[in-house]
Design a protein with these regions (language model features):
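A short beta-strand motif characteristic of beta-propeller blades
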Residues: 1, 31-37, 72-80, 122-128, ...
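Residue-level detector of Asp-centered blade-edge/turn motifs that repeat once per structural unit
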Residues: 10-11, 49-50, 94-95, 140-142
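Structural motif
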Residues: 21-24, 62-64, 108-114, 153-164
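Short loop/turn segments that connect beta-strands within beta-propeller blades
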Residues: 27-29, 68-70, 118-120, 167-169
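Structural signature of WD-repeat beta-propellers
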Residues: 18-20, 58, 103, 149-150
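Repeated scaffold domains used in trafficking and secretory/extracellular systems
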Residues: 2-8, 40-47, 83-91, 131-139, ...
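Blade-level signature of beta-propeller repeat domains, shared across WD40, Kelch, NHL, RCC1
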Residues: 147-195, 206-209
Length: 212
């Protein structure tokens, strides 16, 4: 009997299932290869486009990196002192050279985007959004990165929801979207992290609708 997974993703060669306490790796035929217990509150993972590694993120501010070649832990580290509410999006770059993570930095009301070099998972850049808004998720589509979030006023009250590109260490070309679109696409991205096929619905599609 299979465990009760929160997410279950596949790249056609390996399947990765996360329960929150345990990470399972299966081959494409469903045979269990290994399981890891290096993190708690770890519900979602991402497989590198290169197929050589995968990353698991916990909601308490930690990341674990695993090799799919040796089926072993490569590195585990804390990316933020904020040890709760760390359930925002993450992804690899299209070439697998970088891992991009939305993080709560300072406190749970402030977002950052950190970029890590996958050669050693050292942080190579960080963009802090500050008081003006929050980021919820990030998606790589055809080599470009898109983020979804919301703007805030000086009292930290939400004023508008938006989708934008992320490139060269900054958010660019933001477009405002409706609350319904914001909720719909956040739900789609969550389902994608769970392992569901939502390829026809991307942040790139939403951004393109408003930017043309």
């Amino acid at each position: 009997m299979l465990p009760r997974f929160v997410s279950y993703i596949s790249n056609g060669t390996y399947d990765i299932g996360c329960t929150g306490q345990t990470v399972y790796v299966y081959d494409k035929y469903g045979a269990e290869l290994v399981k890891f217990k290096d993190l708690i509150y770890a519900y979602y993972s991402a497989i590198s486009p290169r197929g050589d590694m995968f990353v698991v993120k916990s909601t308490d501010g930690r990341i674990a990196v695993y090799s799919l070649k040796t089926l072993s832990l490569i590195k585990k580290f804390r990316y933020s002192k904020v040890n709760y509410a760390q359930d925002d999006g993450f992804c690899f770059s299209a070439d697998g050279k970088y891992f991009i993570n939305i993080e709560r930095q300072g406190d749970d009301l402030h977002s950052a985007i950190s970029v890590y070099d996958t050669a050693g998972f050292s942080r190579v850049s960080q963009f802090l959004l500050g008081d003006i808004g929050m980021l919820e998720d990030i998606e790589q589509v055809d080599g470009e990165l898109y983020v979804i979030g919301f703007w805030r006023n000086s009292d930290l009250i939400v004023t508008e929801d938006f989708v934008a590109k992320y490139a060269e260490g900054k958010i660019s070309e933001p477009v405002n979207i409706t609350k319904n679109e914001y909720e719909y696409y956040n739900e789609l991205l969550l389902n994608k992290k769970k392992g569901e096929n939502v390829k026809n619905h991307t942040l790139a599609t939403l951004w393109g609708f408003y930017s043309t």
